């Protein structure tokens, strides 16, 4: 995941990708597995970012996903994953930085957090 434009000096590198936090809860297990009706599922996304090292142009971006499933106001499961990436970004106008941190970086992280949530839900029952 490296994109460099040597003529303009633009740098966009994914240096490291990692799970910062994950959790899975099935508060009503094992009784909840006996219910065959489909639960109501909700998905929430959140993005956060912070500068790790200004001289090196390093930024941590975290894409947080929370999936809740409920049936008759009772929680079936709660899955949460915070997928993080360490990005090296530089050589661009300061005004463009928020777009990169809030659009381009989460776009890179999305397939990884989707896989993490899929594994949590799949292994959780």
Question: For the regions a protein language model found, what residue spans apply to each?
Answer:
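N-terminal intrinsically disordered, cationic/polar leader segments
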Residues: 1-125
């Amino acid at each position: 995941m490296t994109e460099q434009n040597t003529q303009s000096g633009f740098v966009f590198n994914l240096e490291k990708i990692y799970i910062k936090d994950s959790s899975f809860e099935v508060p009503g297990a094992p009784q909840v597995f006996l219910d065959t009706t489909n639960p109501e599922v909700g998905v929430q996304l959140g993005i956060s970012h912070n500068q790790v090292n200004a001289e090196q142009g390093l930024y941590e971006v975290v894409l947080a996903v929370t999936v809740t499933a409920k049936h008759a106001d009772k929680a079936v499961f709660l899955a949460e994953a915070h997928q993080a990436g360490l990005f090296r970004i530089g050589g661009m106008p300061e005004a463009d930085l928020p777009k990169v941190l809030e659009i381009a970086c989460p776009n890179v992280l999305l397939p990884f957090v989707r896989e993490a949530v899929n594994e949590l839900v799949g292994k959780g029952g």
